[in-house]
C-alpha cells in the first residue's frame, strides 16, 4: 500500500475517498497525529489518484465531492469528527521552526512600524559593505524584514503552508537547512541588482515551492507536495514581476535564486528515490 497524503480535516478526507470510489479506486483512511492518512491499495492507480488529488486540493469544497459522499452513503458516517479553531489549525499544520519564524517576522514588522524601516534595517539588512560581512546574522536576517501588510501576509501564508508540511514530514533540521541556504543565496543574488535595500521571506518561500513541488513529483512517498496548478501560478507570478505588470517593487533576483536553490536541493535529496523508480 502507498500513503497518498495526510489531511487534518476528516470530512474533506472522507469526501475525497468517496469521490475516488465513484471512479473505482479504493482508498483507506487511517488516523494520524496530524489528522488522517489516506492510503492506496493498488499502486498502479497512484498516478490517477495524484492527478485527482491535485484537483481536489485546488477546490476541496466543490459540490461534486459532496455529491460523491451522498452517493456512497457516508454523509452521516460515525467517524469521530473534531472541530478545530483557527489557532488549533494553524498550530497543527506547523512545527516549532515554522511558528517561530512567523512570530519573529510579525515582531520585526511591528518594530518597523514603531521605529521606522531604516532603524531596523541598520541592524538586520543584508551587509552594506565588507565591514559588515562578519555580522553573520545579516546573511539570513534580511529575510525577516517586511515593508507592508500585504507583503508579510503573502509570505507568511506560503511559509506556513509549505514550511509547515515540510517540517512535519521531513523534520525541523531539514527546514532549517533549506531556510538558511536559500536566505543566503537569494539575498546574495538580489544584492547584485539592488544593493542591500531589500528584505522579505519570498526568496525562502520560492525555495520551498521548488523543493516541495519537485520532491512531490520525484518522491511522493515522502508525504509533501505542491499541486502543479499552484506551482504554475507561482512561476507566472515570478515572470510577471519582471514586466512590472502590477506596479509593485518585487525582488525578482531573490525569487529566481530561491527557486533554483530549492529545486537543486530537492533534486539532490530525491536522487535515490528517482533511481529506484527507474
Curated annotation (Swiss-Prot):
It comes from the Bacteria. The active site is at residues 202, 255. The chain crosses the membrane at residues 94-114, 143-163, 175-195, 196-216, 224-241, 245-267. It is an enzyme of class 3 (hydrolase). One of its GO terms (cellular component) is plasma membrane. Keywords: Cell inner membrane, Cell membrane, Hydrolase, Membrane, Protease, Serine protease, Transmembrane, Transmembrane helix. SUPFAM superfamilies: Rhomboid-like. Rhomboid-type serine protease that catalyzes intramembrane proteolysis. HAMAP family: Rhomboid_GlpG (MF_01594). This is Rhomboid protease GlpG. The gene is glpG.
Amino acid at each position: 500500500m502507498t500513503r497518498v497524503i495526510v489531511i487534518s480535516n476528516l470530512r474533506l478526507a472522507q469526501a475525497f475517498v468517496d469521490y475516488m470510489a465513484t471512479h473505482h479506486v479504493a482508498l483507506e483512511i487511517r488516523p494520524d497525529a496530524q489528522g488522517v492518512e489516506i492510503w492506496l491499495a493498488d499502486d498502479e492507480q497512484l498516478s490517477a489518484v495524484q492527478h485527482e488529488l491535485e484537483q481536489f486540493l485546488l477546490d476541496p469544497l466543490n459540490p461534486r465531492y459532496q455529491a460523491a459522499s451522498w452517493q456512497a452513503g457516508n454523509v452521516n458516517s460515525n467517524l469521530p469528527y473534531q472541530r478545530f479553531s483557527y489557532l488549533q489549525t494553524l498550530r497543527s499544520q506547523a512545527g516549532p521552526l515554522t511558528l517561530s519564524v512567523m512570530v519573529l517576522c510579525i515582531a520585526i514588522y511591528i518594530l518597523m512600524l514603531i521605529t521606522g524601516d531604516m532603524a531596523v534595517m541598520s541592524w538586520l539588512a543584508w551587509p552594506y559593505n565588507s565591514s559588515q560581512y562578519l555580522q553573520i546574522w545579516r546573511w539570513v536576517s534580511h529575510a525577516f524584514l517586511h515593508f507592508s501588510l500585504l507583503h508579510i501576509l503573502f509570505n507568511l501564508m506560503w511559509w506556513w503552508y509549505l514550511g509547515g508540511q515540510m517540517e512535519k514530514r521531513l523534520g525541523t533540521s531539514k527546514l532549517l537547512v533549506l531556510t538558511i541556504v536559500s536566505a543566503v543565496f537569494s539575498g546574495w543574488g538580489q544584492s547584485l541588482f539592488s544593493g542591500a535595500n531589500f528584505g522579505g521571506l519570498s526568496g525562502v518561500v520560492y525555495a520551498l515551492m521548488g523543493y516541495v513541488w519537485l520532491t512531490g513529483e520525484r518522491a511522493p512517498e515522502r508525504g509533501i507536495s505542491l499541486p502543479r496548478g499552484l506551482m504554475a501560478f507561482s512561476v507566472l507570478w515570478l515572470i510577471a514581476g519582471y514586466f512590472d505588470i502590477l506596479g509593485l517593487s518585487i525582488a525578482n533576483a531573490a525569487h529566481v535564486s530561491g527557486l533554483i536553490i530549492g529545486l537543486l536541493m530537492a533534486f539532490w535529496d530525491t536522487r535515490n528515490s528517482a533511481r529506484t523508480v527507474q
